[in-house]
């Protein structure tokens, strides 16, 4: 199935869903929601991941031309959570996650966070670290 989500510019984005990737069922609103709100709701149990998404991609999964967002420094980093395909593509696919979709990218990030904490996103920690400290999150930041 698909769900429509509005980005901050007011454009509608189609979000694909897959059997192994669950959408947030608790988002119940009368009108369109922003993609930021969708991400924050998805990560409501691990709010540091929403802050990481803001720092990594400014809450974007796709470029304005519709292509999956890739990293500015490392083109292997993809999507809203900037998951590095070199390190994670095989594991993500074996687990049933498609990193090129919004739901797959966020669901894999949640799985990665459960096993490795914030370490995979240490490169952007200067941006989100203050939120982790405020939320009493455990940090695994290499100096």
PLM regions and their residue ranges:
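N-terminal secretion targeting segments of exported proteins
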Residues: 1-16
């Amino acid at each position: 199935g698909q769900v429509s989500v509005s980005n901050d510019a007011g454009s509608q984005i189609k979000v694909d869903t897959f059997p192994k990737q669950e959408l947030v069922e608790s988002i119940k609103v009368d009108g369109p929601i922003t993609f930021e709100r969708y991400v924050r709701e998805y990560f409501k149990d691990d709010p540091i991941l929403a802050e990481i998404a803001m720092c990594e991609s400014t809450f974007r999964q796709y470029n304005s031309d519709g292509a999956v967002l890739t990293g500015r420094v490392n083109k292997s980093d993809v999507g809203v959570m900037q998951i590095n395909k070199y390190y994670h593509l095989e594991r993500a696919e074996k687990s049933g996650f498609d990193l090129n979709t919004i739901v797959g990218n966020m669901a894999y990030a949640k799985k990665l966070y459960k096993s490795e904490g914030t370490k995979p996103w240490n490169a952007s920690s200067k941006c989100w670290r203050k939120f982790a400290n405020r939320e009493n999150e455990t940090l695994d930041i290499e100096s």
